[in-house]
């Protein structure tokens, strides 16, 4: 562990396939415990046989060059609208790049070309309204792209061209109102898609056609009113589905058809008064047990005979039900305020 300034180059070493950010921060903490002191204008550096990991935060200066063996770089919490054009020059072994909380408004199309081995790009909490086409032309190995909490109102398919190995895409906390058709068509390796906390009212029917093994889908905190029967059909391996905090008033019959490996379903805080018979039939059947549970609280359930199918399902799955005391009937008057589970038991 040492300080590093732009006047002190370092000879390259080996490469670690993936240096986790958590491990990096732990190493920095350990170095502090050992009494290592750093100049306030220098970035923090951890050097090992696997390469250099560098963290820069104010009042440190943004580096003018990087050691050739850099595998991890964090430049965060600076008041920047643009990055230095040559920031990544000479760092061809870089695998993780964290640029969160900088106020970035745009990126150059050539920005990532010097780092063809990049696997993680974190752009959380910036001011990006778009990405330049061609940004990812040299990013065939990128696995994780985080664009959380920017100012994206639209997405263009062309922005993501070149991403062949993408496994995790986080677009949460933006201002997205709609998505283009074919957005994920080429992302066959995608495992996690996070579209939570946007302003989406509808989703393109082909949204999930492309990924072959999607495991996590975050759609919470949007304005969705209807869940169609075909949206989830291409993803039989889906394990976590978050639809909470929308305006869902209707879930189509068959919407969950084939989701036999689902571990977690969150439908809480929507506008559901009823659901079609047979909706729950495939969930947890025949050999899966919804091991991480489900939540249907915060909906205005009308607890009449139209929920008989749901009553039966709840009786079988009650041990996995979250927020049981907050899952209550909004009507009819005779059962208003009672828990849905209590009504189910009385049937």
From Swiss-Prot:
Its main location: secreted. InterPro entries: Cys-rich_flank_reg_C, Leu-rich_rpt, Leu-rich_rpt_typical-subtyp, LRFN, LRR_dom_sf. It is found in: Secreted. Gene3D superfamilies: Ribonuclease Inhibitor. It comes from the Eukaryota. GO terms for molecular function: transforming growth factor beta binding; type I transforming growth factor beta receptor binding; type II transforming growth factor beta receptor binding. PROSITE patterns: LRR. One of its GO terms (cellular component) is specific granule lumen. This is Leucine-rich alpha-2-glycoprotein. It comes from Homo sapiens.
